[in-house]
Amino acid sequence: MIRSARLISNIKFGQKNIRQFSTNTNWWANVQKGPEDPILGVSIAYNKDTSPSKINLGVGAYRDENGKPYVLDCVKKADKKIYEANVDHEYAPIVGVAAFNQLAAQLALGEECKHIKEKRIATVQSISGTGALRIAADFFARFLKGKTAYVPNPTWGNHNVIFNDAGIPVKSYGYYNPATCGLNFEAMTKDIAAAPEGSIILLHACAHNPTGVDPTAEQWKKISEICKERGHFVLFDFAYQGFASGSPEKDAAAVRMFVEDGHNIALCQSFAKNFGLYGERIGAFSILTETSDQALNVESQLKILIRPMYSNPPVYGARLVQAILKDKELTNEWRSEVKGMADRIINMREQLVKYLKKHGSTRDWSHITTQIGMFCFTGLTPEQVDRLANEYHIYLTRNGRISIAGINSTNVEYLAKAMAAVTKDN
């Protein structure tokens, strides 16, 4: 009887503990639903719309004349070469595919870059541009402690989030002038000069996102001088090489100028837009150093940082870019194709302005053609953007940014007519 009583008591005690434990399994009751990404939200609204006239001007990916995703012919040929080579699927090193890293640095900095020739550069493969920026932010948090990152106002939305998540304070410098839809160079240089010595200055190498507004060569020179005088550390976000002007060399001019001026920059590259490899998530992060020993030290620390982050990068995108850039014929084909994409975007800018005038708009839309790259800051107000969505089924972000890649010969006049209507008397 005593043993039975103890057994019953133990069972009841166990059941009580189980009940107590089960009440503690609801770990996530305090997690609230987060806000939707404002850019991705545009596509969600577009997909819900059933109108045959709908246009998505929020997507950050190139589309062909028929509004379809575009796979470059040089990528198809590189893909075929890789398949026929019957390559394995082993892990890449932590730093990624070495040949890709070398070619990526050469594409951005030029084959004659002294840092490359003298091995005064540490380059690692990254998970596209976002991954490169995250590596940069985490590295700066460890080795540029106490520094603040300065980003243009406005800038790509992920910049602030990435630096904040890495524990780096973020401030902005003047960049865009809403009155002219152009560069506020005076505010930009004033703010960069006023930043504490040794600050981190993030610059868009070309095709500024979201405005499409870039400094001139003379303005870049002045920015370089100010950064040097103030001892600032310069980080370039280089997501659109070749995609802005159609010339990889022209688009790299600012980056190469800063290096020639003596800046040991950091560089974040993406191969999503210019190679059409969005889903392959292929990028690179580089730091230029004073000596080759410093480059080795930096690389060793980057490996330590990357190992618990994602350990090893995916190899396929790197193999594609490598296959193209190491083959002269494929490289020339890529140059031709990236120019073709850039030229189509430039042409759509011109067509949009032409049709805006045709439909009676008296506003000055010249900024549409002076801005460059995939995106255009139209100057439309949030209320006008809402009207475009509600009345015309045209979707874009509420700051007035449109993706020119979403425009083609079949929808450009409809877009212009709608823009003329919502901006009438404004």
Swiss-Prot record:
Pfam families in the record: Aminotran_1_2
N6-(pyridoxal phosphate)lysine modification, residue list: 273
Reaction equations catalysed: L-aspartate + 2-oxoglutarate = oxaloacetate + L-glutamate; L-kynurenine + 2-oxoglutarate = kynurenate + L-glutamate + H2O
Principal subcellular localization: mitochondrion
Cofactor(s) listed in the protein's UniProt record: pyridoxal 5'-phosphate
Superkingdom in the source lineage: Eukaryota
Gene Ontology BP, a term: aspartate catabolic process
Protein's cellular compartments: Mitochondrion matrix; Cell membrane
GO cellular component term of the entry, any: plasma membrane
Assigned keywords, A-Z: Aminotransferase, Cell membrane, Membrane, Mitochondrion, Pyridoxal phosphate, Transferase, Transit peptide
SUBUNIT field: Homodimer.
General remark: In eukaryotes there are cytoplasmic, mitochondrial and chloroplastic isozymes.
InterPro entries assigned: Aminotransferase_I/II_large, Asp_trans, NHTrfase_class1_PyrdxlP-BS, PyrdxlP-dep_Trfase, PyrdxlP-dep_Trfase_major, PyrdxlP-dep_Trfase_small
Record function comment: Plays a key role in amino acid metabolism. Important for metabolite exchange between mitochondria and cytosol.
Protein name: Aspartate aminotransferase, mitochondrial
Gene designation per UniProt: aatA
Broadest EC class assigned to this enzyme: transferase
Chain residues that bind substrate: 60, 156, 209, 401
SUPFAM superfamilies documented for this protein: PLP-dependent transferases
Organism: Dictyostelium discoideum
Protein family per UniProt: Belongs to the class-I pyridoxal-phosphate-dependent aminotransferase family.
Transit peptide, start-end: 1-29
